[in-house]
A protein has these predicted regions:
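C-terminal hydrophobic helical "lid"/dimerization subdomain
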Residues: 17, 75, 119-177
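Helix-to-beta-strand junctions that scaffold the AdoMet/dcAdoMet cofactor pocket
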Residues: 81-82
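Rossmann-fold dehydrogenase core element
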Residues: 86-88, 99-139
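Helix N-cap at the beta1-alpha1 junction of Rossmann-like dinucleotide-binding domains, i.e.
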Residues: 29-30, 71, 94
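Short amphipathic alpha-helix with an adjacent loop that forms part of the alpha/beta core around
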Residues: 49-59
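Short glycine-/small-residue-rich Rossmann-like dinucleotide-binding loops
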Residues: 48, 68-69, 91-92
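N-terminal Rossmann-like NAD(P) cofactor-binding module of classical short-chain dehydrogenase/reductase
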Residues: 62-65
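Mid-domain Rossmann-like dinucleotide-binding core that forms the NAD(H)/NADP(H) cofactor-binding site
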Residues: 1-48
């Protein structure tokens, strides 16, 4: 899982509960405890080590879900895939991804993009979340400050999911950070 933000923190939980050996890739040592608390078996800190090399030391990834929208961070991950591995891009970077074609051609690796699932897939994901007690981490903001919350989200400053709350406290039941 590349990225431990709004999508990545959920992806780590899903992957772990689905029985996958889960590796979280982030930047900065302060994220390691969170990644492991969410269910990651291994945390790779890209501030101190090359993510692709770390993944290859672990045997090469069968799949990497790229959630943090950084083309500079995503492109090199192709080399961390095992043979016939897949890089699945869900966080859309503004800048292009730079990568070598060699690992794609000589390892049968591939890159896919995914925007959203079908209605049935969404229902299945929600049912699985309930069954496995997977919960989003949220940052709450009063409804009156919706414009500020939107601005933080657009600038990439939001941590996890932004949730607008009304005076009666709507947004009960989620984990608040």
């Amino acid at each position: 899982m590349q990225g431990i933000g709004g999508l990545g923190h959920l992806g780590i939980q899903f992957a772990r509960h689905m029985g996958f050996r889960t590796v979280a890739i982030g930047r900065g040592g302060e994220k390691e405890k969170l990644a492991k608390d969410l269910g990651a078996h291994v945390y790779v800190d890209t501030a101190v080590e090359d993510a692709a090399a770390a993944l290859q030391r672990l045997g090469g990834a069968r799949a990497i879900l790229a959630t943090a929208p950084s083309g500079d961070a995503m492109g090199p991950l192709v080399s961390g895939l095992g043979a016939r591995g897949k890089l699945i891009v869900v966080g859309v970077p503004l800048e292009p991804m730079q990568l070598s074609a060699f690992p794609l051609v000589f390892g049968g690796r591939s890159i896919y993009g995914s925007l959203a699932g079908t209605a049935i897939e969404t229902e299945d994901a929600l049912a699985f979340s309930v069954l496995e007690n997977i919960r989003p981490m949220i940052e709450t903001v009063p409804l009156e400050r919706a414009a500020e919350a939107y601005d933080r989200m657009i600038k990439g400053k939001a941590r996890f999911r932004m949730v607008l709350v009304t005076k009666d406290g709507a947004a009960q039941g989620a984990t608040v950070n």
